[in-house]
Amino acid sequence: MICIILGLIINLGGWFGNDLIHAFTGFAFSGSRSEQSAGSAVRATDDAIGTFDKVEGNIDAGNVKFVYGDDYGFAYDNYPEKEIPKAEINGKTLKITQKVKNKNRIGDFKNGYNGAEIVITLPEDMAVDVDLHLSMGAVETKGITFGDMKLDADMGSIELDTVTVKDMDLTADMGAITVEDSVFSDGDIKAAMGGIELKNVKFDDADLEADMGGIKINGSFNELKARCSMGGIDVTADDDDAKMNLSADLGGITVNGQSVGRSYKN
């Protein structure tokens, strides 16, 4: 009976989280002025917003991604007119805010905000620090070099591909975290309802925790600490002398292809 209940929880959690995550699909945008499009959704780009070396944001709904360009830039796409994101330069920090006036309209997040997106453009020679909190939306970024990074997603996934980061702090309450072909120094990564996967990564030290979801890692690292409450841990380490401290409450642990039970420390 317990196994059946746990299975239902996991299946429902996975379905619910994926449904919400996939509610946010990216839309392309162009132009340097605000436009009115179907469904009272607004798109806009700001061509010259000044230089910055840090990005801070508090975003109620929508995806966020970073891209390289010739200059600094901020753009948004497919937001309701009354809830478009706001951006300002404060010192050397780009501050972004986006507020949903009535957060009880859960259905609107899927229907009215489908494709809502914020795009931040950086020059290739600039590695900015990032501190973003998203209530409902995903972060997807590929091929960017950052300074320190802190991402906190309440409902949505975090996907980083081919990025370089100094210190990485990632949290997803309902959504998966994936870091692929990337390099970082120290990492603190937590997922409450969703898995954590680090694919072909290189790092010095990382602390990973998943409450309801598995952890899978392959790459080169010096030290790794990982804990799972409900899920397994699978680690493939390129370095023979890599230090690991692993524990799984409800799930098995595999290290370099060998099953080691529910706890492992070397």
What are these model-derived regions, one by one?
Residues K99, D161-V163, D167-A172, A176-N266:
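Short, surface-exposed interaction patches in beta-rich subdomains
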Residues N11-V100, F109-H133, A138-K150, I158-D161, ...:
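Short linear S-[DN]-x-LW-Φ motif typified by the pepsin-like aspartic protease active-site region
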Residues I2-C3, T51, K202, S220:
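Hydrophobic alpha-helical segments and their boundary regions
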Residues M1-L12:
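Hydrophobic membrane-insertion alpha-helices, especially the h-region
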